[in-house]
Amino acid sequence: MSAADAEYRVRHQSFWFVACLAVLVAQIVTEYLMGRVPICACGYVKLWEGGVNTSGNSQHLSDWYTPSHIIHGFLFYGLGHLVLRRKPLAAKLLLALFIESGWELLENSPLIIDRYRTATIALDYYGDSILNSAMDTVFMCLGFFFASRAPVALTVAIAIFFEIFTGYVIRDNLTLNVVMLIWPVEAIKVWQGGV
């Protein structure tokens, strides 16, 4: 590879990464304009919020739903690998960020907040803080980068472990969250309420 080719490649990758950063910034600004709180209304920021049905859930840097966002990264890397096979990694990341940021905006809209409150055990859910939502997107990116480097079998094993572990500890995980959002099952809701 010539010096000119190397310079072009660096410039090209830089473009994609700047575009990725722009998507995250657009997510944050949009959530601010939607009236989301920047940080927990409690006035402080915690590295980890271990309560599930607490006012601090979805308000701090990480929580029991962080593994779900890491799994999003695994899945979105796989999608990018399939549909953008010849594109650079940063282009695949941009696709992942569009999907994750789009979900974060939808998740924090009145439509989905109300759906969570009526169809799931999240009766006190009022949406994510901007900080938590941005960190959900960052954790998705971490999952994406992990999946881009790790063997597929290891990535799948970690995803299964996350699902089983969070399902056991808090009776919720990515799979149950999707099921309860799209097609609520009363028996699952009752089981989840036993936490």
Curated annotation (Swiss-Prot):
Its main location: membrane. It holds the Pfam family DUF2585. GO terms for cellular component: plasma membrane. The chain crosses the membrane at residues 15-35, 64-84, 127-147, 150-170. It is a multi-pass membrane protein. Keywords: Cell membrane, Membrane, Transmembrane, Transmembrane helix. It is found in: Cell membrane. InterPro entries: DUF2585. Belongs to the UPF0314 family. This is UPF0314 protein Rleg2_3744. It comes from Rhizobium leguminosarum bv. trifolii (strain WSM2304). The lineage of its organism: Bacteria, Pseudomonadati, Pseudomonadota, Alphaproteobacteria, Hyphomicrobiales.
